A protein has these predicted regions:
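Membrane-anchoring hydrophobic helices of lipid-metabolizing enzymes
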Residues: 2-126, 160-161, 165-166, 171
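Short, composition-biased local secondary-structure segments
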Residues: 24-28, 131-136, 186-199
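Short glycine-/small-residue-rich flexible loop motifs, especially phosphate/cofactor-binding loops
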Residues: 56-57, 136, 164, 208, ...
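Hydrophobic (often cysteine-bearing) scaffold residues that line and stabilize catalytic clefts
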Residues: 71, 155, 159, 267
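Catalytic core of membrane glycerolipid acyltransferases/transacylases, capturing the structured
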Residues: 118-178, 203-209, 216
Length: 302
């Protein structure tokens, strides 16, 4: 019992020290953080090889038509993006509203604003592409309705709390995936926008649907589509685009205005078609180090 308590205290101590260091890093100028990111790329890619096998396999399977030279070029570009992404995420702890607005621009938000004028709550989705964290943080600075972002909590409580504080600094509300239906019910009379990262991997025994995505049979979550059909809320996609280091633009694209008129899996298929087109156009900015295809369809009869 005492040894378990001691281990817990040591873990919390290391976590607290880590968070203190991250908060310190966050206060540094953005230009200096990008300098550190450029340095971090070399040990991460060439020495540590962080998830390099996963990234390489994902790229090879996703782009069978590309040569190994082309694959490696995308791979290196991804790791450069990933190191910037890590430090941009840390910057969320201190970034000002004005700087975030300057760095993340939303286009054609009139699509959202029209639904708001009509008194309609909205469902929105995006993928783990570019800097989705900055995108969600910047969303709370627009004229969009109250945003509820669905997320998976981190196992470490201290780091989960740190992330939560960063993500909600400007008014967004983050709710754990398991609480989605409860919060939907409790806010049904309010004007809201629920946001989903629709490219997460489902738990093996919960897989219900596979679709073709990046040349592979891919298990996907159906939560967004199920909620859309239950609530008949319009569904939009936030398409993020990298402009230059630290600068992004987000385009809004309608998936459907009336889910009741869609066919089975149409909403899910359309959201993944949009993401696939984005990745094919500029592949380096998706989260390739995630084990997206860890499940085999033979494991599941769905």
């Amino acid at each position: 019992m005492h040894s378990q308590f001691a281990k817990l205290m040591i873990k919390k101590s290391f976590s607290s020290t880590g968070i203190f260091f991250l908060n310190f890093l966050s206060l540094l100028p953005t230009s200096l953080l990008y300098f550190f990111a450029a340095l971090l790329y070399y040990p991460l890619y060439y020495i540590l090889g962080y998830r390099k096998k996963v990234v390489r396999q994902n790229l090879v399977n996703s782009f069978p038509q590309k040569s190994i030279e082309e694959i490696i070029k995308i791979e290196k570009a991804y790791y450069r993006h990933f190191t910037r992404l890590v430090l941009e995420t840390i910057k969320m702890a201190s970034i000002s509203e004005s700087e975030l607005k300057k760095r993340v621009k939303f286009n054609n938000l009139q699509i959202v604003e029209q639904h708001v004028k009509n008194g309609q709550s909205i469902l929105a989705c995006t993928g783990h592409y570019c800097n989705w964290e900055w995108g969600m943080l910047a969303l709370s600075l627009t004229l969009c309705p109250q945003s509820y972002v669905i997320f998976k909590p981190i196992n470490n409580e201290l780091f989960d709390s740190w992330f939560y504080k960063m993500r909600t600094r400007f008014g967004n509300r983050f709710i754990a995936m398991k609480q989605t239906l409860r919060v939907l019910a409790s806010t049904r009379n309010e004007l809201t926008m629920f946001c989903f990262a629709n490219d997460q991997t489902p738990v093996g025994h919960e897989i219900q649907y596979w679709l073709p995505f990046l040349n592979q049979r891919t298990p996907v979550l159906l939560g967004l589509e199920k909620i859309a059909l239950q609530t008949n809320r319009p569904v939009i996609y936030f398409k993020m685009k990298h402009i230059k280091n630290g600068y992004y633009e987000v385009d809004c694209e309608t998936i459907c205005n009336d889910p009741s008129k869609t066919t089975e899996h149409q909403i899910t298929d359309m959201s993944f078609n949009i993401l696939e087109n984005m990745i094919n156009e500029n592949p380096a900015y998706w989260l390739w180090s995630h084990r997206r295809w860890k499940h085999n369809k033979h494991e599941n009869a769905g």
